[in-house]
Amino acid sequence: MFLAAATDVYEKSSVLCNFQLKGTTMKRRQMLKNIPLVLSALGFSRMVRAQNPAQLVKDKAEWKKLLSTNAYLVLFEHGTERAGTSPLNAEKRPGTFVCAACNLPLFDAAHKYESGTGWPSFFQPLPGALGTSTDYKLIYPRTEYHCVRCGGHQGHIFNDGPKPTGKRYCNNGVALAFVPQGQALPALRT
């Protein structure tokens, strides 16, 4: 919408504007073509995504009321549960692992494996369920992944998993809930 309005102003304007950028001349039309790139670099895409009806946006106070203290700290403060403490480590039944915050299905139990790390690990998520970002909390870059619907932090991706992906989605158990096969998945939280 913004780009269309800006283009319309350009089309109706009889003034030709040039912009100086690091010693080069950029005509207005060239500048307008680059607006989407600039806006996405400034985080505009996050604003648009937050308005998507599929997204679940709640403030931290709301999440604190809905979740256990540990789940809140992991999901929305990017904490990590202590290794070996999740009962989901031993979960081997067929079923689906859903986000503990919004109930979005994230992993099929068929993609879970024993990684020996002390956290539930998967080699493949359900399509479109996760988003990623880079974090530097341990100084070196790691790929963090989160629920694409509510943004809740789930864990990190490592390149030491089994075939066919070679990936290990190392998940905080407190960020997941397990739904056994044959039981209805919970409704998505609103």
Task: Identify the meaning behind each predicted range.
Residues 45-77, 81-82, 186, 190:
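C-terminal segment of N-terminal export signals and the immediately downstream linker at the start
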Residues 96, 144, 167:
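Residues immediately within or flanking Cys/His clusters that coordinate Zn2+
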Residues 17-39:
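N-terminal secretory signal peptides and thylakoid transit peptides that target proteins
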Residues 103, 151, 174:
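Cys/His-coordinated zinc-binding microdomains
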Residues 108-109, 156-157, 179:
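Short, non-ligating residues that shape and space the ligands of small metal-coordination modules
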Residues 164-190:
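N-terminal targeting pre-sequences for secretion and organelle import
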